[in-house]
Design a protein with these regions (language model features):
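Basic, polar low-complexity surface loops/patches
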Residues: 1-201
Length: 201
């Protein structure tokens, strides 16, 4: 296998910082996705999957969207519950010495959508955060698109789960230590990993 190109090395280094997000990586007039992000992006966005070095052992799956249509595609991914990291060129390619400097300038998550175009009409867009001590759950619900904020305390896992399901969150925030709680597996069955963001304890 040939060594990775400098651009792919740069992509992988940036992607390693955002492993739970689909990385939109700016290359000229396009945002490109590579490797697993490309396969997922192609499938979820119904766009062509191609590859660099097509037909060779070291081919790299890729797909892309024009930069001026990126918002539409990001919106589709958010509606499907994905996070998107937007990586832009942060220096003029004409002035770059070597590889163009790139960095993530924004991370989009399903629970933090404020653009009414990205939201369905009449539906809440709840971001839910919670903590737990024993069998007592503290819950906070935030809809950033309307400014609505509510909080409550609930005893028992079933009551907690029922309240979370009733509010249909787009994203859930939890401390990593919840993964060691006896209720974790039951919670994960209902929400999977894509919807939950784990924060450092």
């Amino acid at each position: 296998m040939k060594p990775l190109t400098p651009v792919i090395k740069q992509y992988l280094q940036i992607k390693s910082q955002y492993p739970d997000a689909i990385l939109f990586f700016r290359m000229g007039d396009f945002y490109e996705m590579f490797f697993e992000d490309a396969r997922l992006g192609s499938r979820e966005l119904d766009i062509a999957l191609t590859s660099r070095n097509k037909g060779q052992k070291d081919s790299v799956p890729l797909c892309g969207v024009p930069y001026f249509t990126a918002e539409t595609y990001i919106s589709k991914l958010l509606q499907k519950g994905y996070k998107v990291a937007l990586c832009d060129q942060v220096e003029d390619p004409k002035l770059a010495k070597g590889i163009v400097k790139r960095e993530v300038v924004r991370v989009f998550t399903p629970g933090l959508v404020i653009d009414t175009i990205q939201l369905g009409t009449g539906e809440n867009n709840y971001l839910i955060g919670f903590s737990v001590e024993g069998e007592v759950f503290g819950l906070a619900f935030l809809d950033i698109s309307t400014g609505e904020l509510k909080a409550c305390q609930i005893s028992g896992f079933e009551a907690f789960l029922s309240e979370v399901l009733r509010n249909e969150p787009k994203e859930i925030l939890s401390l990593k230590r919840f993964q060691e709680h006896p209720c974790y597996e039951g919670f994960k069955k209902n929400f999977g990993n894509g919807l939950i963001t784990y924060l450092d304890n």
